[in-house]
Amino acid sequence: PIPTFYKRLQAGQGCFCSDTVRDFLDMSDFLELMDRVMDSGAPSGIYNISTGEGHTIKEIFDIVVSHLGLRLDEPVPIVPPGDDDVPAVVLDPSETERRLDWQAKIGFEETIRRMLAWYDEYGVTDVYSHLKAGLGQASRGE
């Protein structure tokens, strides 16, 4: 939802948030673990690579709104998860942390802010979503 929110809000278009929770991992943390595993001959197995922390889509929306300096004309609609969506996806990384001596270092807000800084510099071209276009309007804040 991050590039979708960014692009739509930049264009003054409305958005909505699905009432879902997700576990967001910074790619730097992921890649650091991949480098470590490939270089060390770590034990094989199935690992959850995650923070173990759940965050609502609305939390992301609020960070994007703040980053863009927007003032909403009305609250963003929160809609129930669609038939093809899952209410919550939060993984338990404890086995990964224990067996690979690894833990995510970059927090949720920092991860989102890094993505937004990248969008500020390079823009957002195409966005892909299984969700239908949303509601609500935003305007530039003072």
Language model segments and positions:
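C-terminal substrate-binding subdomain of Rossmann-fold SDR/epimerase-dehydratase oxidoreductases
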Residues: 9-142
